[in-house]
């Protein structure tokens, strides 16, 4: 006899496990299916984000930055550190231990909330039945009143640079290097490429980033992107725009990459090559032919604004549907869907999903860019404030970057907050909170911010929108 559940979730990544926990909290009998095998040879919860994405990459970013600080930044504080070295295997092991602790934490949360966990591959059949193929090959069918598909995404592979065991790798492989490559190539100047390139550049690698687009970080505000390109180039990343990779050849533990740019055909030889050209939804053997769920022209599961698929009672969330491939988007979609299944009228504001690139300085934004608003014909007022004028940033010797606030010229409503600088990921969230409640630049300017803090840069940028900044000269007084 098949087991029956109110909710069956396929996938235990940041969308799936959060959806399962919230559904269980709401009193729904919930099951969650996961097939990912971790480094220890066991099923590991948490999806790409926790196992081979967000968390492990941040661990390496933080470790590599501490090494950089010890070598380059301590001396300005009067601290002398001689003979600083890096133990790459130890750094990677620390990362793995963090992942292990967090995946175990999700299992504990499942148990605490009464979520039934199934190990294996989940496949949606007709009539909201879900087939689970266990690790031993045995199958069972679960009956569900509601199904949430959260199967995630995987790295895109490209024909000119097929992956090898250890020379040409994707983002997952780039987290496992046991030594610093002398010369590192990265295909793709997106979030993943820049973060991983930064890790190994700080540790001493000569890094070249090949980006096919002619524009750097096209989704970011142009002023912020321009500043980011300047800063990252100064840090040693050789970012080649308009560079389209056409071939690669592995020979004697190195790879020679052929690409074309404005100067014609070029060749570069690297010790390692990271392919970071984006991700694609995981739908392989996910949907039976008679499941009724449809895909769009790009292979994503089609959903409406509430993540409903073409089949009543079947939902899809996260990377397998349209929109930004971000863990926090997936998680909040999971909460929204669980609550709607339980009869609540939950909504999600897709216009206020923050984006972050965890380089140093961090790059983060929420809302619309200045160029987008101008293209839409919206008149705006803009305020900026450099961290070079921030007392707290000076005290930390971390003064690169700026905060930018964009407001509607007619209503003063804040339409975008963009940051490059220390703690940008945290600062932009303050802007997001205000924007969620319809804040104006004047509202932010009237708030009392603690002193001295990096947050004061947001305060001053908001004041600058209307020409009222205190700690910089205002370009325009209104």
Curated annotation (Swiss-Prot):
Chain residues that bind FAD: 34-49, 58, 122, 319, 327
Reaction catalysis annotation: N(6)-[(R)-dihydrolipoyl]-L-lysyl-[protein] + NAD(+) = N(6)-[(R)-lipoyl]-L-lysyl-[protein] + NADH + H(+)
Alphabetized InterPro entries for the sequence: Class-I_Pyr_Nuc-Dis_Oxidored (IPR050151), FAD/NAD-bd_sf (IPR036188), FAD/NAD-binding_dom (IPR023753), FAD/NAD-linked_Rdtase_dimer_sf (IPR016156), Lipoamide_DH (IPR006258), Pyr_nuc-diS_OxRdtase (IPR001100), Pyr_nucl-diS_OxRdtase_dimer (IPR004099), Pyr_OxRdtase_I_AS (IPR012999)
Transmembrane segments: none
Active site: 451 (proton acceptor)
Cofactors required: FAD
Annotated EC: 1.8.1.4
PROSITE patterns in alphabetical order: PYRIDINE_REDOX_1
Keywords from the named record: Cytoplasm, Disulfide bond, FAD, Flavoprotein, NAD, Oxidoreductase, Redox-active center
Family membership noted in the UniProt record: Belongs to the class-I pyridine nucleotide-disulfide oxidoreductase family.
Other comment: The active site is a redox-active disulfide bond.
Protein name, as recorded: Dihydrolipoyl dehydrogenase
Source organism (scientific name): Pseudomonas aeruginosa (strain ATCC 15692 / DSM 22644 / CIP 104116 / JCM 14847 / LMG 12228 / 1C / PRS 101 / PAO1)
């Amino acid at each position: 006899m098949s087991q029956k559940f109110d909710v069956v979730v396929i996938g235990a990544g940041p969308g799936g496990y959060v959806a399962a926990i919230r559904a269980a909290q709401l009193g729904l009998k919930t099951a969650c299916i996961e097939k990912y095998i971790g480094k220890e040879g066991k099923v590991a919860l948490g999806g790409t984000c926790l196992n081979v994405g967000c968390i492990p990459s941040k661990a390496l970013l933080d470790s590599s930055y501490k090494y950089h600080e010890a070598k380059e930044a301590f001396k300005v504080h009067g601290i002398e550190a001689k003979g600083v070295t890096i133990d790459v295997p130890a750094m990677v092991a620390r990362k793995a231990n963090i992942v292990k602790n967090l995946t175990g934490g999700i299992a504990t949360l499942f148990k605490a909330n009464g979520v039934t966990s199934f190990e294996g591959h989940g496949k949606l059949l007709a009539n909201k039945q879900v087939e689970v193929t266990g690790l031993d090959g045995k199958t069972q069918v679960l009956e569900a009143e509601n199904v949430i598909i959260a199967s995630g995404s995987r790295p895109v592979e490209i024909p000119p640079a097929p992956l090898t065991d250890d020379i040409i790798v994707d983002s997952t492989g780039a987290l496992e290097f046991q030594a610093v490559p002398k010369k590192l190539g990265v295909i793709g100047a997106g979030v993943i490429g820049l973060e991983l390139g930064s890790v190994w550049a700080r540790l001493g690698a000569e890094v070249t980033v090949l980006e096919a687009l002619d524009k750097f970080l096209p989704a970011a505000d142009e002023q912020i992107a321009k500043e980011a390109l300047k800063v990252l180039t100064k840090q040693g990343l050789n970012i080649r725009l308009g560079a389209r990779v056409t071939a690669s050849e592995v020979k004697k533990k190195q790879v020679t990459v052929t690409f074309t740019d404005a100067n014609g055909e070029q060749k570069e030889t690297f010790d390692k090559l990271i392919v970071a050209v984006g991700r694609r939804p995981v739908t392989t053997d996910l949907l039976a032919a008679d499941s009724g769920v449809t895909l769009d022209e790009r292979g994503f599961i089609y959903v409406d604004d509430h993540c409903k698929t073409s089949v009543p009672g079947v939902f899809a969330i996260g990377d397998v549907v349209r929109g930004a491939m971000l863990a926090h988007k997936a998680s909040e979609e999971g909460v929204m869907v669980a609550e709607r299944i339980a009869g609540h009228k939950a909504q999600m504001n897709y216009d206020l999903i923050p984006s972050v690139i965890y380089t140093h300085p961090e790059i983060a934004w929420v809302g619309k860019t200045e160029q987008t608003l101008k293209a839409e014909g919206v008149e705006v007022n803009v305020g900026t404030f450099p961290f070079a004028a921030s007392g707290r940033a000076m005290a930390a010797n971390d003064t690169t970057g700026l905060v930018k606030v964009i407001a509607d010229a007619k209503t003063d409503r804040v339409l975008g907050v963009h940051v490059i600088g220390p703690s940008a990921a945290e600062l932009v969230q303050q802007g997001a909170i205000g924007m969620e409640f319809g804040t104006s630049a004047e509202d932010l300017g009237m708030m009392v911010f603690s002193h001295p803090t990096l947050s004061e840069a947001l305060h001053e940028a908001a004041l600058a929108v209307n020409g009222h900044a205190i700690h910089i000269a205002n370009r325009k007084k209104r």
